[in-house]
């Protein structure tokens, strides 16, 4: 089971949780292998080029399957032709947070402040082309505001920038900011999901603040090499759906601020297409490239 990100990353955590259960149910031990690099492209290419026999799977986020096809001019794999979706395993919203350098305690108040002083505030991200970058850029476009992007290398660095005052805003995974929110060091202004998150029910959606069409949930999905026999894919899908309903799995996912999904391959393919459609105009307009 290839994870195109490092040990301890969210895809890695989800992969190991599912891997343990899948190994038990199938009576065949899967081994999680981390292959990070190039925004997830290295590991995803390894899945795409693997023998399609059901013995090599991948757990990845949307990026290597959607946005990376736009951010990188030359990929060594074609996700549309070489990757078979199995199911989205889990999802989490991104959370827009602010430090005490920003006036206003609600998203509408923040928007008023941003419009009053265009370019005054900046936001930290986990890196160029990351969902934390693209989501905030889309918020700026949809709300008609001007927010300066400052890229960092990880969610931890992005949070550190908020706490030090180098940045005032960010759009980050709940796990990265919930501790600082509870401590009163950061304010949660909105989530990027279509509906309020069960994990943060008191935090409104962007739509509630009048900003439409900025769904930017981060999801983790299981894939296989294209050409894997349909009966194998169907069996894997059935097992995954059953695993994601286990109380202990739901509890462990909730503990890391994830919500289980377990949808169909067709629904996962639709999610990839939706992400591609959402990010393509933004990436092209602002000439965002990682080459």
Residue spans of the language-model regions?
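Hinge/capping helix and adjacent helix->loop/strand transition within the periplasmic-binding protein
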Residues: 22, 49-55, 70-157, 206, ...
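Cytochrome P450 heme-binding Cys-pocket and its upstream "meander" loop
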Residues: 209-210, 214
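A ligand-binding cleft/hinge motif common to bilobed small-molecule-binding domains
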Residues: 64-74, 138-142, 169-203
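Stable alpha-helical elements in mature extracytoplasmic
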Residues: 10, 14, 18, 43, ...
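An extracytoplasmic/periplasmic, membrane-proximal ligand-sensing/linker region
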Residues: 205, 230-291
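N-terminal (or domain-start) structured segment
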Residues: 1-81, 120-122, 128, 144-169, ...
């Amino acid at each position: 089971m290839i994870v195109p990100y490092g040990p301890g990353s969210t895809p890695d955590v989800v992969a190991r949780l599912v891997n343990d259960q899948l190994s038990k149910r199938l009576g065949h031990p899967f081994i999680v292998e981390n292959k990070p690099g190039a925004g997830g492209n290295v590991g995803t290419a390894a899945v795409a080029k693997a023998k399609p026999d059901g013995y090599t799977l991948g757990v990845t986020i949307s990026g290597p399957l959607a946005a990376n096809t736009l951010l990188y001019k030359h990929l060594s794999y074609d996700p549309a032709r070489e990757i078979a979706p199995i199911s989205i395993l889990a999802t989490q919203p991104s959370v827009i947070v602010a430090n005490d350098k920003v006036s206003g305690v609600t998203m509408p108040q923040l928007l008023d402040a941003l419009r009053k002083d265009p370019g005054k505030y900046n936001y930290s991200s986990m890196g160029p082309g990351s969902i934390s970058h693209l989501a905030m850029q889309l918020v700026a476009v949809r709300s008609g505001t001007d927010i300066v992007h400052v890229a960092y290398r990880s969610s931890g660095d992005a949070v550190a920038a908020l706490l030090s005052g180098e940045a005032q805003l960010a759009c980050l995974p709940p796990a990265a900011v919930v501790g600082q929110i509870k401590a009163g060091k950061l304010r949660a202004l909105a989530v990027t999901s279509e509906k309020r998150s069960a994990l943060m029910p008191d935090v409104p959606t962007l739509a509630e603040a009048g900003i439409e069409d900025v769904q930017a949930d981060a999801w983790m999905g299981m894939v296989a090499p294209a050409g894997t026999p349909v009966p194998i894919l169907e069996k894997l899908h059935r097992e995954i759906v059953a695993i994601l309903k286990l109380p202990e799995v739901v509890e462990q996912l909730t503990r890391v601020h994830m919500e289980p999904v377990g949808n169909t391959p067709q629904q996962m393919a639709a999610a990839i297409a939706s992400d591609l459609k959402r990010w393509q105009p933004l990436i092209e307009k602002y000439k965002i490239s990682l080459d």
